[in-house]
């Protein structure tokens, strides 16, 4: 077994001062039966813990590290920016530069506002939609996670699903009553809800590729129906591309699936590994935001120069690499092909999903299209798989509800080693 002695001690010390010993619940390795590795450093496709174990990393800081950890150009840009100061609390030219870059990649984002987290982005986008429409209700999809804002912690996936508590204590009934929930990938139920409530719904928010019930792409016609119904009822369609943005394709899910939303939320990659996110969309909606309009939103560190610099450099590096999307998608497909072959050989039912460079697996015999399907996957087999992979120095997300990520830094050798490890791990899963 892998030696996590120092990590165990660090975890015990952390629990004295932080809830669960972590600053985000899933990091505590719930139900995995081992302490979380405490990280010392990371470089490229590898991450090293305080016990000296080095792993091939498919978590990628949960998505941002698309170029790999500590990319030299990104680090150099951050260092140069830090020498000028870490924060100003005032406008800078680089904020306009990143806004222009994002608009170039996402033409549907005519104006945007920088914030510090995906949660801030989704909360602010919903407030803008309510202000723009004058309506109160919103509609989300079961199993889709949009951060920890009160109105969105209703049947959420990801960390909430891991803990078996899709609704959070502390969220008032008054807040929850304005949030409608529809099954992801169910066209008929959504259309019925819109027929009944559409004229009172300010916004429909969706992960166009669900990334918090593991990785679940949309079925044919689902996103098209969302677009048609929201247009019919004057409802704002918000794509939460905090996770799938720049991943499912460089131009996002809206380009891959040819759907133009009214608003988009971005995060993770646009901060280059530092805290940054953004929300934006149609000019007439964004003109409702203060100081131009009456919808208030602000932030001391919004547009922080270090995060914006890291984001600009990350986007420029991605743009400079020919066929960037194709390279990552091919690597991901190769890895999943190897995992599927290993599962078949071990007699383990396995469903593999991929959208660009985000991917996931389900220990299940039937196709996974929504949150209930994801919940039916074999949790015991996942645990056996996860622990075996960790023991072989493969760093995966410690929950069957989390998506995995490929980076440009992953080499053919990394993928070969990971497939080799998967053969042993699938044998362990078969015995679970």
Predicted region positions:
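Conserved N-terminal phosphate-binding loop of PLP-dependent enzymes in the Aspartate aminotransferase
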Residues: 1-432
């Amino acid at each position: 077994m892998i030696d996590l002695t120092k990590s165990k001690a660090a975890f015990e010390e952390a629990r004295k001062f932080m809830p669960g010993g972590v600053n985000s619940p899933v990091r505590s390795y719930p139900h995995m039966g081992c302490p979380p590795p405490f990280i010392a450093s990371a470089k490229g496709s590898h991450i090293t813990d305080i016990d000296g174990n080095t792993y091939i990393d498919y978590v990628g800081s949960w998505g941002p590290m698309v170029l790999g950890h500590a990319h030299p150009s990104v680090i150099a840009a951050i260092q140069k920016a830090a020498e000028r100061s870490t924060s100003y609390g005032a406008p800078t030219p680089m904020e306009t530069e990143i806004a222009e870059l994002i608009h170039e990649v996402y033409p549907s984002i005519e104006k945007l506002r920088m914030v510090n987290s995906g949660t801030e982005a989704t909360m602010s986008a919903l407030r803008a939609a309510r202000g723009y429409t004058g309506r109160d209700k919103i509609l989300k999809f079961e199993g889709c996670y949009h951060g920890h804002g009160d109105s969105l912690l209703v049947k959420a996936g990801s960390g909430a699903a891991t803990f078996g508590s899709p609704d959070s204590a502390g969220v008032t009934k008054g807040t929850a009553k304005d949030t409608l929930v529809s099954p992801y990938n169910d066209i008929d139920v959504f259309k019925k809800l819109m027929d009944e409530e559409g004229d009172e719904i300010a916004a429909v928010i969706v992960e166009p590729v669900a990334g918090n019930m593991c990785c679940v792409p949309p079925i044919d016609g689902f996103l098209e129906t969302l677009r048609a119904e929201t247009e019919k009822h004057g409802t704002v369609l918000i794509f939460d591309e905090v996770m799938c943005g720049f991943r499912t394709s460089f131009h996002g899910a809206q380009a891959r699936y040819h759907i133009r939303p009214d608003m988009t939320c971005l995060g993770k990659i646009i901060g280059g590994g530092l805290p940054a996110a953004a929300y934006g969309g149609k000019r007439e909606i964004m003109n409702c935001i203060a100081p131009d309009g009456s919808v208030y939103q602000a932030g001391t560190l919004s547009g922080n120069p270090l995060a914006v610099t890291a984001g600009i450099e990350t986007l420029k590096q991605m743009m400079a690499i020919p066929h960037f999307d194709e390279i990552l998608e091919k690597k991901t497909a190769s890895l999943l092909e190897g995992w599927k072959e290993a599962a078949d050989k071990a007699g383990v039912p396995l469903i593999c999903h991929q959208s660009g460079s985000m991917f996931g697996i389900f220990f299940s015999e039937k196709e996974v299209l929504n949150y209930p399907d994801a919940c039916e996957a074999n949790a015991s087999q996942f645990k056996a798989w996860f622990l075996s992979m960790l023991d072989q120095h493969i760093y995966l997300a410690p929950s069957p509800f989390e998506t995995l990520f490929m980076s440009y830094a992953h080499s053919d050798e990394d993928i070969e080693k990971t497939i080799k490890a998967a053969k042993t791990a699938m044998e362990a899963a078969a015995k679970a």
